[in-house]
Amino acid sequence: MYKRQEDDYDSEFRFDTRPLPSLQGMAGADGPVVYLSTCSRSLAPGIRIAYMVLPEHLLPAWHAKYRLYSGTVSRFEQQTLARFITGGYFTRHLARERVAYKARRDALTAALNAAFAPGELTLTGLHTGLHLLAHLRNAPPDAALHAAARAQGVRLSLLSDYDLTGSGSTAPAPLCWVTARWRMTPAHRWAKR
């Protein structure tokens, strides 16, 4: 039986560093890791194709149990994606996406750094993924920060939204999560506001 499950979230978007090897790749074809991923961030959320790479020793059991299973994604979409990948188009697409998202990230970090006094803001998580963390030194209460950002047309996901202690919106917001996959004014225009 497998012992580890790896969800390779945003691994294809590393900007200033080399990609990390997957646990499944390091463990080998028959290692104890089941690798899970999706195309929703790298291609489009609407495609809704996820995949898993099973260790070889689990393949017979998988085929026996799920050979008649019909997924929710049509065979046409699956085969189209397979040809997109095997034809090298996916690799080229990811290279273009990395350049585009790196430019967005750079514009966003420049705009954020310009908007705060030195020492008031520290950004982390810049080297990978489609998000970053903004550490605010003298942060207003979470609800006030969220309202001010929304008034400017900026959608923030605050880490306190995921706080299980219940302190939520009354606590200071030392951290907020900013995603580069927004559907609003492009980041390069933020600095002009």
Predicted regions and their residues:
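Short, small-residue-biased leader/transition segments that mark boundaries at the very start
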Residues: 1-2
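Conserved Walker B
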Residues: 8-10
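Active-site PLP attachment segment
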Residues: 26-61
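Short hydrophobic/aromatic beta-strand micro-patches
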Residues: 53, 133-135, 178-180
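Active-site C-terminal subdomain of aminotransferase-like
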Residues: 57-77
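Structural signature of PLP-dependent enzymes
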Residues: 63-66, 87-109, 139
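Conserved glycine-rich beta-strand-loop-beta hairpin in the small C-terminal domain of fold type I
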Residues: 99-109, 121-135, 145-148
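PLP-dependent enzyme catalytic core of the Aspartate aminotransferase-like
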Residues: 151, 167-193
